[in-house]
Amino acid sequence: MHRSISIRILITNLMIVILGLVGLTGNAIVFWLLLFRLRRNAFSIYILNLALADFLFLLCHIIASTEHILTFSSPNSIFINCLYTFRVLLYIAGLNMLSAISIERCLSVMCPIWYRCHRPEHTSTVMCAMIWVLSLLLCILYRYFCGFLDTKYEDDYGCLAMNFLTTAYLMFLFVVLCVSSLALLARLFCGAGRMKLTRLYVTITLTLLVFLLCGLPCGFYWFLLSKIKNVFSVFEFSLYLTSVVLTAINSCANPIIYFFVGSFRHRLKHQTLKMVLQSALQDTPETPENMVEMSRNKAEL
C-alpha cells in the first residue's frame, strides 16, 4: 500500500514538473510580448497580470514537486508553509483577474457607450493593483488563523470559519463568472442587436471554461473539503493529487489557448508569436473590410 502511494506521488510530481515547464515557457512568452512588444489595452493588462500569476504559481509547483522527487520524503515544513502561502496568494489573484476580465468584457458589450466614453483610462491598472492587494490580505488572514499545514490548527474554529469565508468568496466569484458569461452568450445569440463574435470573446470564453473545469474545483477542495476530514477522509489523498495536477493544467493552458485562437484560420508560416497573440486579443469582427485593414496593420509590424 505504501509502495503504491509512493509511486502515485512520484508520477504526480513528474506530471506537474513537465506541465510546469511547458506552462512556464508559454506564460513567460505571453508576459514578455505584452510587456515589451505589444501596445497594451484594457484587456491585455489583465492578461499580462494573469500570465505573471500563472508563471509564479507554476514555479511554486515545480519547486515543491522537484523537492518531493529528490528527497522522497516530506520537505521542510517551514519552506512548504511559505511556498503554500505564496501559491494561495497567486491562486486567489488569478481567480480575481479572470473575474475582472469577465466583468469588463460584459460591461463593454452591455453598456458600450458608457464603456467607451466614461470608463476611466487607468481602470485596468488600478483594478489589477487592488486585486493583488486584496489577494495578499486574504492570504495573510488565512495564514494568521490557520497556519496552513500546521496540524495544531486542525480543530481551530477560527481556521474553519476562515475556510468557509474563503469558500463563500470563491462561490461569489463563481456566480460572477457564470452570470457574466451567460449574459454575453445571450447577447451573442439572442436579440435584435446581437453581438458579433470576435477572437477576444473566444479567448476569454475558453480561458474561463478551462478555469471552471480545472481551477475552481481545486479551490473548493483546498479551502473546504480538505478540512472536513470525517466525511472525505477516504478520498482525501486522491482528491489532493487530482487538485494539484488540475491547477497545473489550468495555469499551463492559458498560453496554449491564446496561441490557438490567434493562429486559427491563419497561415502559421506568415505569423510571428507577436502577431498570433495580437490576433487572439483582437476585439473586432472579422468582416472582409476588417480583414484587409488588419492585414495592412500586420504588414507594418
Swiss-Prot record:
Q: Which InterPro entries does its entry note?
A: GPCR_Rhodpsn, GPCR_Rhodpsn_7TM, MRGPCRA, MRGPCRFAMILY
Please give the PROSITE patterns that the UniProt record associates with this protein.
Answer: G_PROTEIN_RECEP_F1_1, G_PROTEIN_RECEP_F1_2
Q: Extract one GO molecular function annotation from the record.
A: G protein-coupled receptor activity
Q: Any stretches that span the bilayer, and where are they? A: 16-36, 43-63, 78-98, 129-149, 164-184, 204-224, 241-261
- Quote the subcellular location field of this record: Cell membrane
Q: Which Pfam families match?
A: 7tm_1 (PF00001)
Give ranges for the Cytoplasmic compartment.
Answer: 37-42, 99-128, 185-203, 262-301
* Positions on the Extracellular side per record topology: 1-15, 64-77, 150-163, 225-240
**What is the role of this chain?**
Orphan receptor. May be a receptor for RFamide-family neuropeptides such as NPFF and NPAF, which are analgesic in vivo. May regulate nociceptor function and/or development, including the sensation or modulation of pain.
Protein name, UniProt field: Mas-related G-protein coupled receptor member A6
Give the originating organism: Mus musculus (Mouse)
